[in-house]
Amino acid sequence: MAARSSTILSELPTGHEFSPPPFDLTREYLAAYASATRDTSAVYNEAGLAPPLAVAARALGALLDVVGLPPGSLHTGQEIEMRAGVPASAKLTLSGRVAQRSKRAGMIIAVLQFDVTANDAAEPVLMGRTTVIMPQEQESQA
């Protein structure tokens, strides 16, 4: 597992862009995903494709390698749009940004917008939005 980043999502402004290094979607990862979700369908395996939510989960995992979440964070929403099938052994690239950020009642609400491309294609195979609510850091009283 890669070391977690010291960059914390709650500290990033609207418009901040991130692009983790490319990452592989492996058959081993897909088998672990199928086991964890208890997905016994062979349809994706027979077609040589990855399940859409496996692609999204792998992409968000790569994002968490470069952007950390403070303790007490809640993942409150997820939207994904698959634009194309993803080969089971694809090299994926994620690019994203903080699309919205607001503060309310001591909490920070951040919406991350991201695109995932496969095998250096020009067009994304997946587009998504993730909403996270995090506690606002308390200023130290010195």
Q: Which residue stretches match the model-derived regions?
A:
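A structural connector/turn signal
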Residues: 81-83
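Hot-dog-fold acyl-thioester-processing enzymes
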Residues: 1-77, 139-142
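HotDog/MaoC-like acyl-thioester-processing domains
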Residues: 1-9, 85-142
